[in-house]
């Protein structure tokens, strides 16, 4: 039954991955591997993504695989999420608002023994999505203009299988083994705006795949009579990605291709690499009512992309803080049993891009989040809602700033699959 459930979820997840795409509208995703997504569930997103020290029996925390061992020995947990939102891009006095919507993740967790558990699922790794253009004067022609259109789309997904175990009380170890795969397409078109004119088209496609490993540990101990502290740490080594890049430049007229200027395919096992990632976290819980979390992460993106002619990867630092409060888990009142979550996080973008003068500039990203967890009738399963506000601030004037408002909806089913029935 374990293998059948695993096969069912993974097969469905791969099919859904092919459709996930509209999660970002950012011109900055043109560079590198796109916008990097945090590997967090709906519940932990409301905590700012702080989860390295989180160890709960009813939450799938794939950010630290050591947490899997906390699952109850007689339950099966399935968690999936979807999001919708709006992005607002600003450049000078110009604003552009666009709607977003996307499948986010599907994960499951179940025990193998009392001290070991397995998790599997599909999560986004990066996404690319942008549409923008500019109109410029045609050199040598009075009152003539041409338009340059840019468009990009695609995503990379993380299909993982993980396990966690508890060799002795309070100390847990875990590992995720992931397959990263996806495709991204970039198109640039020059339109001269006259009937019968030639239209240059520049097409680029990146297809990449590879493996990723995450290892984690957690150690929990009592802090006072009713408090508990859990320390967490994770590490992911830098591994190569197999990549294929296709470059196609042509000139069209109407619906026909006049000439092809370039048609190249480049394959490599070293053009792109996964970054080294190091994370430390702490969680403090009190009387099953209050939960406080904090994370620090350092991701070594430098030297992970060989082609730095357009942009340069830099090492990334990220912090996250979160808090969760439950008034009374045993109350008959739904409002008293609900979880109220809050979080904040900040990071620098892992790519630096040139400004108008050609100087490489970075950007900072800050996120505020809030959410609720609504227990279902069985008091084991949950409806999770998270609202996030994200702001991307470039470190140079004149560059595009971005604001995102996103609502994520999650369903977390906790089923008693492995309990023995007693017949009278």
Tell me the role of every PLM-derived stretch.
Residues 1-24, 424:
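Bacterial Sec-dependent N-terminal signal peptides
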């Amino acid at each position: 039954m374990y293998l059948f459930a695993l096969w069912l979820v993974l097969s469905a997840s791969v099919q859904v991955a092919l459709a996930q795409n509209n999660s970002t509208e950012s011109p900055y995703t043109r560079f590198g591997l796109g916008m990097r997504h945090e590997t967090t569930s709906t519940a932990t997103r409301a905590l700012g993504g702080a989860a390295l020290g989180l160890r709960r029996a009813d939450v799938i925390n794939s950010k630290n695989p050591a947490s899997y061992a906390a699952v109850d020995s007689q339950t099966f947990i399935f968690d999936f999420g979807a999001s919708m939102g709006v992005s607002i891009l600003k450049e000078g006095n110009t604003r552009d608002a666009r709607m977003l919507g996307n499948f986010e993740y599907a994960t499951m967790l179940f025990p193998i023994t009392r001290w070991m558990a397995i998790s599997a699922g599909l999560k986004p790794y990066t996404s690319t999505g942008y549409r923008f253009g500019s109109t410029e004067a045609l050199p040598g022609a009075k009152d003539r203009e041409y338009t340059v259109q840019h468009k990009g789309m695609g995503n990379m997904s993380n299909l993982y299988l993980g396990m966690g175990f508890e060799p002795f009380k309070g100390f847990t170890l875990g590992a995720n083994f992931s397959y990263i795969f996806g495709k991204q397409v970039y198109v640039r078109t020059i339109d001269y705006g006259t009937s019968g004119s030639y239209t240059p088209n520049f097409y680029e496609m990146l297809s990449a795949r590879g493996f990723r490993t995450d290892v984690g540990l957690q150690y929990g101990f009592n802090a006072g009579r009713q408090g508990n502290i859990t320390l967490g740490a994770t590490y992911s080594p830098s591994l190569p990605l197999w990549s294929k890049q296709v470059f196609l430049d042509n000139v069209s007229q109407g619906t026909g291709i006049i000439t092809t200027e370039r048609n190249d395919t480049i394959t490599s096992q070293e053009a792109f690499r996964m970054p080294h990632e190091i994370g430390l976290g702490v969680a403090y819980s009190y009387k099953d009512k209050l939960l406080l979390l904090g994370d620090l992460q350092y991701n070594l993106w430098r030297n992970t992309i060989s082609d730095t002619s357009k942009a340069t990867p830099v090492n990334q630092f990220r912090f996250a803080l979160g808090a969760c409060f439950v008034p009374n888990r045993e109350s008959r009142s739904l409002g008293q049993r609900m979880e109220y979550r809050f979080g904040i996080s900040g990071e620098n973008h892992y790519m630096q891009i040139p400004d108008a003068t050609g100087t490489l500039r970075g950007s900072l990203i800050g996120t505020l989040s809030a959410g609720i967890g609504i227990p279902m009738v069985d008091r084991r399963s949950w409806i999770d809602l998270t609202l996030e506000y994200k702001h991307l601030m470039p470190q140079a004037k004149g560059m595009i700033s971005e604001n995102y408002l996103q609502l994520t909806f999650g369903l977390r089913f906790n089923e008693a699959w492995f309990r023995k029935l007693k017949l009278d």
